[in-house]
Design a protein with these regions (language model features):
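Glycine-rich phosphate-binding loop at the start of an alpha helix
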Residues: 46-50, 133
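Short, conserved alpha-helix that lines the donor NDP-sugar binding/gating region
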Residues: 53
Length: 154
C-alpha cells in the first residue's frame, strides 16, 4: 500500500503575484520512500495544492504496478470536493464549464489528475490541516519551506 500526502502554500493568493510552494511525501507500508518540494511563482494556493498532488504521483508512477493500491491525502477542500462531489464529471459533460457558467479554473492541471479519479487503484482522502496529522504537518513544512526558498527543487 502506497500513500501520498501533498500540500500547497502561498503568500498572496493572486494569480500573477502569488509566491508559493508545493510539497509531497510518499510512503510504502508506512515507511517514507520519497519526498519533494518545488518553489512556485505567479501562482495561487489551489494551483500549489494541485501541483503537489501531480508531482507526488509523477514520482510514484514509475514505482507502481496496476495491482498496487495508492491513497492520496490532502487538506485541500478544493481537490477533495472535486473528487467526492463529482464536480469533475459535470465539468467533462459541460465542456469544462463550472456551475457558475464560467470556464473551470486550472483546467490544465485537472486534466492530469482526473484520470486518477476514475481508476479504482487510487483513493482520495481529506485530512484536516494543522490538526496534528503527522504526515500532513510534514508536507505543510515542505511546502512552506519551498515557498520561502527561490529555486528550490528536490
Amino acid at each position: 500500500m502506497y500513500k501520498i500526502y501533498c500540500d500547497g502554500a502561498t503568500s498572496n493568493n493572486k494569480k500573477n503575484e502569488g509566491i508559493g510552494g508545493c510539497g509531497w511525501v510518499i510512503l510504502k507500508d508506512g515507511e517514507k520512500i520519497n519526498e519533494g518540494a518545488i518553489h512556485l511563482e505567479g501562482t495561487t494556493n489551489n494551483e500549489c495544492e494541485l501541483k503537489a498532488m501531480i508531482n507526488g504521483y509523477l514520482q510514484l508512477s514509475s514505482m507502481i504496478t496496476s495491482l498496487d493500491e495508492v491513497e492520496f491525502y490532502t487538506d485541500s477542500a478544493y481537490i477533495h470536493n472535486c473528487y467526492s462531489q463529482g464536480w469533475w464529471r459535470k465539468w467533462l459533460i459541460n465542456g469544462w464549464i463550472n456551475s457558475k457558467k464560467q470556464p473551470v479554473a486550472n483546467k490544465e492541471l485537472w486534466e492530469l489528475i482526473i484520470p486518477l479519479f476514475n481508476n479504482k487503484q487510487f483513493s482520495f482522502y481529506k485530512v484536516k490541516g494543522h490538526q496534528g496529522d503527522y504526515w500532513n504537518e510534514y508536507v505543510d513544512k515542505l511546502a512552506v519551506s519551498a515557498k520561502l526558498m527561490k529555486n528550490l527543487k528536490f
